[in-house]
């Protein structure tokens, strides 16, 4: 979660109107993770896929708290 927010702040630091949107990228990482895992699904073991998707879902469980 922190990495997404820091990347957003890095690119929008000099834009005062956009700096308040730092929480939005936090909620989008699961979509990217699912896309990447499905693309490489033949090369990733089932255990690793389960761990990556589970970690991403736990990470996104905190997104509504931050967004509200």
UniProtKB/Swiss-Prot annotation:
Keyword terms: Cell inner membrane, Cell membrane, Membrane, Transmembrane, Transmembrane helix
GO biological process: regulation of pH
Membrane topology of this protein: Multi-pass membrane protein
Domain of life: Bacteria
Cellular location(s): Cell inner membrane
GO terms for cellular component: plasma membrane
Major site of localization recorded for this protein: membrane
Spans traversing the lipid bilayer: 21-41, 48-68
Any Pfam family the entry gives: Na_H_antiport_1
Molecular functions (GO terms): sodium:proton antiporter activity
Disulfide bonds: none
Family membership: Belongs to the NhaA Na(+)/H(+) (TC 2.A.33) antiporter family.
Stated name of the protein: Putative Na(+)/H(+) antiporter NhaA homolog
Native source species: Rickettsia akari (strain Hartford)
């Amino acid at each position: 979660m922190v990495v997404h927010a820091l990347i957003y702040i890095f690119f929008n630091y000099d834009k005062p109107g956009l700096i308040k949107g730092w929480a939005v990228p936090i909620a989008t990482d699961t979509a990217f993770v699912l896309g990447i895992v499905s693309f490489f699904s033949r090369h990733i073991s089932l255990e690793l896929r389960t761990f990556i998707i589970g970690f991403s879902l736990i990470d996104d469980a905190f997104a509504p708290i931050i967004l509200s």
